[in-house]
């Protein structure tokens, strides 16, 4: 499947939910929860656009590359793929990661850190899509999700931009609710791979430019939607 990345493609192609669960547990054991990277020169952003009711089950995936200082988009690449794995909460990586990794692989340069639209370890089996991708491609990743999938905060979140509270499960920190824009719902930030939670929060807040989403996932979201609309208009 991949020329740049050395991983077993079966980690993305389970033939049953039971096998998918086993894969998630195996990959979760490989996650690094500490900072294991040099200062990033380029950020990556990943998101998909699709219609769950599309009978063709086509997914439109985008990976972008941004300059880490100016947060300007340097390159972007989008791919479309027909999906065979069903939409099941908690198993998003098997549905979306294959297309996202293909989009990432075709960038002229790989990012030093990737912001993924979705959960990292804030997941029932500690392997959301950000962690799934991070472990397979071995690039530091951060999960940037819009809704809580797993875990609960122990206190209320403040109303100021930059406020955050941790999410807990089984007595451990697994993520954080982070206020990135006034009068907007917080984001759920979590470690994907090779980035600690507190560092992930810091990088997300540094990448916010007046919007709810940090620029890497915001720009990927815009590009994925534009690609889907353009592709569907041509059919």
UniProtKB/Swiss-Prot annotation:
GO molecular function: deoxyribonuclease V activity; magnesium ion binding; RNA endonuclease activity, producing 5'-phosphomonoesters; single-stranded RNA binding
UniProt keywords, alphabetically: Cytoplasm, DNA damage, DNA repair, Endonuclease, Hydrolase, Magnesium, Metal-binding, Nuclease
Catalytic activity: Endonucleolytic cleavage at apurinic or apyrimidinic sites to products with a 5'-phosphate
Location of this chain's protein in the cell: Cytoplasm
Pfam family of the protein (one): Endonuclease_5
Predominant subcellular localization, coarse grouping: cytoplasm
Binding site for Mg(2+): 47, 117
UniProt superkingdom: Bacteria
EC code: 3.1.21.7
Site (Interaction with target DNA): 87
HAMAP family with a match to the protein in the record: Endonuclease_5
Family affiliation: Belongs to the endonuclease V family.
Entry protein name: Endonuclease V
Organism whose genome encodes this protein: Protochlamydia amoebophila (strain UWE25)
């Amino acid at each position: 499947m991949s020329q740049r990345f050395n991983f077993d493609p079966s980690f993305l192609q389970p033939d049953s939910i039971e096998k998918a669960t086993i894969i998630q547990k195996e990959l979760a054991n490989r996650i690094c929860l500490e900072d294991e990277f040099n200062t990033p020169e380029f950020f990556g952003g990943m998101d998909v656009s699709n219609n769950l009711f599309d009978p063709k089950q086509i997914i439109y995936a985008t990976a972008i590359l941004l300059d880490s200082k100016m947060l300007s988009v340097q390159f972007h690449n989008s791919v479309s793929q027909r999906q065979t794995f069903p939409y099941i909460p908690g198993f998003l990586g098997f549905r979306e990661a294959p297309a996202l990794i293909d989009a990432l692989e075709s960038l002229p340069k790989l990012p030093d850190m990737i912001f993924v639209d979705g959960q990292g370890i804030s997941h029932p089996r500690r392997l959301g899509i950000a962690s799934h991708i991070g472990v397979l491609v071995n690039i530091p990743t951060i999960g940037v999700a819009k809704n809580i999938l797993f875990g609960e905060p122990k206190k209320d979140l403040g109303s100021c931009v930059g406020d955050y509270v941790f999410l807990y499960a089984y007595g451990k920190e697994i993520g954080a609710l982070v206020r990135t824009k006034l009068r907007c719902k917080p984001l759920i930030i979590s470690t994907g791979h090779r980035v600690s939670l507190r560092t992930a929060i810091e990088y997300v807040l540094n990448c916010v430019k007046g919007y709810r989403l940090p620029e890497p996932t915001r720009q990927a979201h815009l590009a994925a939607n534009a690609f889907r609309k353009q592709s569907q208009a041509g059919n």
